[in-house]
A protein has these predicted regions:
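Extended, charge-rich low-complexity interaction segments
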Residues: 52-58, 62, 188-200, 395, ...
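Short amphipathic alpha-helical surface patches that mediate protein-protein
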Residues: 134, 353, 408-411
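SAM-dependent methyltransferase catalytic region
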Residues: 1-159, 165-169, 178, 182-191
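C-terminal substrate-recognition regions of SAM-dependent nucleic acid methyltransferases
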Residues: 82, 86, 166-400
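Hydrophobic alpha-helical segments
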Residues: 103, 311, 411-413
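Class I S-adenosyl-L-methionine
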Residues: 1-26, 31-32, 60, 374-414
Length: 414
């Protein structure tokens, strides 16, 4: 908690900011002036410009006494049991979600911190633990890989209530990927009950293993379709795509307005348009420069589609674009695949515009950002063939009900 929230909490609990005062609904002794709502101002522990405990940026949070440091005592220690020298039957919380880490060179990069609260709360071994947190840990999130693995293998996870739209919990608040609240039960050991909640009216419930995949598939209705793809033995597109920043150009790179005289230049595609750079500046994937490349934007369109009405369907990705030989990209884009001829590149670009591949992507997304792992359930096929959704539905033996679900969830690509 911060100083302000500690004062507000005491006023709510005791009708007084100072529980040892005569105005407190329950008067604590002078030795406990804060009652049971303890606040102690502490400082971050800086190492190489970051807090050792929460990863906050020193430039942002190395502040004077007049400003809140947001160095939350509950997570700024190595032994939370010594801090909380008491037993807890129940822990309930809505922890802080993130703090600026000074990354990206813009000062707006943020690092999740909510998982530290969850992990430390577990260390206290309460009978029950429930917290509401962003759902980005399901399949992504900066620095959340170990946390995701720990949560997916925790057999004490009894219930996850998943809201794909954060506004169903927090009206007017858009959190890309939605939010969830979970019940962790110390005495429980088994599969987890997953509740898909949408529009405050519809809840789809199933009980299943959390660790079936290396990411959490939140949509209960998608599981059977994913199983059918995996049973087919077809390759995964994730094993054949390129990682971010395939040529070594960061998002801010723009190049020159025209080719440089006397220099072997290639075209650079950035979020600002087109420029020209010396081919010598390409730092990796040199063999791909002369090929046709199929690219998409690296983020989910429309601010993560947080305002999309599910009845209208989701796009999931931007439209695919084909780049010619001697055209490269900055890390504002993802390079999905390269081809020696334009016909196969065109076939693949049209394939990625189909509903089925985007449906299979959709269930691995929990934030605005797209990465290689989001293609792990997208089939990698022979692109000498021009595929259709109908061909894919037949290939993976989808039922009429499953086909209708895919068709209703994903909108046509313009």
């Amino acid at each position: 908690i911060t100083e302000l929230t500690s004062l507000l909490s005491r006023r709510s609990l005791y009708c007084s900011k100072f529980p040892s005062s005569e105005w407190s609904a329950y008067q604590f002794p002078e030795s406990k002036p804060q009652g049971n709502v303890i606040y102690q101002r502490i400082q971050h522990t800086w190492k190489e410009g970051k807090c050792l405990y929460c990863g906050a940026s020193q430039n942002e949070y190395d502040r004077g006494e007049e400003l809140e440091t947001h160095a939350y005592q509950f997570i700024h220690n190595f032994d939370v049991k010594k801090l909380c020298n008491m037993k807890f039957d129940v822990i309930i919380g809505n922890p802080p979600y993130q703090m600026s880490d000074g990354g990206s060179g813009t000062g707006i990069s943020a690092k999740p911190i909510y998982h530290y609260f969850v992990l430390n709360a577990k260390k206290l071994s309460p009978r029950y633990l429930t917290m509401i947190i962003p759902s980005r840990w399901f399949a992504g999130g900066k620095g959340l890989d170990e946390f995701r693995e720990e949560m997916l293998h925790d057999k004490h996870m009894r219930i996850i209530n998943d809201f794909i739209s954060s506004k169903d919990c927090f009206p007017g608040v858009n959190i890309a990927g939605g939010v969830n609240y979970f019940l962790w039960d110390r005495s429980y050991n088994g599969e987890c009950e997953i509740r898909n909640c949408a529009n405050n009216t519809k809840t789809i419930v199933t009980t299943r293993r959390l660790d079936e995949f290396d990411v959490f598939i939140r949509d209960n209705r998608a599981i059977s379709i994913i199983h059918k793809f995996l049973k087919s033995g077809d390759k995964r597109l994730s094993d054949n795509t390129f990682t971010r920043n395939p040529f070594g150009f960061i998002s801010k790179d723009r190049g020159e307005e025209s080719p440089i005289d006397g220099v072997d230049c290639i075209k650079l595609i950035s979020s600002a348009g087109e420029g020209y750079v010396p081919i010598s500046l390409v730092s990796k994937n040199h063999n791909e420069i002369g090929k046709y490349k199929v690219i998409i934007g690296k983020v989910v369109p429309c601010n993560g589609e947080v305002d999309t009405n599910p009845q209208d369907g989701y796009k999931v990705t931007t439209s695919s674009r084909i780049l010619s030989p001697n055209e490269v990209i900055t890390e504002s884009y993802l390079m999905l695949h390269t081809f020696d001829n334009k016909k196969e590149a065109d076939s693949f670009a049209k394939y990625m515009a189909l509903k089925f591949p985007r449906f299979m992507m959709k269930h691995t997304l929990s934030s605005m950002n797209i990465s290689t792992q989001n293609f792990q359930f997208v089939p990698y096929l022979d692109y000498k063939i021009y595929w259709t959704d109908e061909m894919l539905y037949e290939r993976y033996h989808l039922t009429r009900e499953e086909i209708d679900y895919v068709e209703s969830m994903i909108r046509p690509m313009e």
